[in-house]
Amino acid sequence: MALRNIRKYGDDVLRKECREVEEIDKRLLVLIKDMLETMYDADGVGLAAPQVGILKRLFVIDIGDGPLVFINPEIIETSGKQIDEEGCLSLPGKMEEVMRPNYVRARALNEKGQEFEIEAEELLARAILHEYDHLNGTLFIDRVNK
């Protein structure tokens, strides 16, 4: 396992749409472990593959309840509203208030290739939606409440 370089705001890779993961192989499993290690080292709660320069539809999250891996995620449903401050490992030191849905239902594959659905509220919903945005080239500053 190794720490990966977190791409910072201004890097073109952060604005690109990611491709689906076609195969969960040894290289992808190493990437997932590296992403988790990098996220924990940076005191983050989430990290998406484009943040380490990989244009794959993959992100990891840990809000304190253990790591979650999302491969080829889909957002099925959202509802409600919440406004809270967000930050991003690609924009160190920047915090802004962002309105997001308070509830999300998502579907993805885990690192074993098993499909799962998750229902989340509050911080976990915010983290899922924040990381999902990265896969489409969107940063939280694009959603700042003006």
Model-derived features: positions:
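Positively charged
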Residues: 1-146
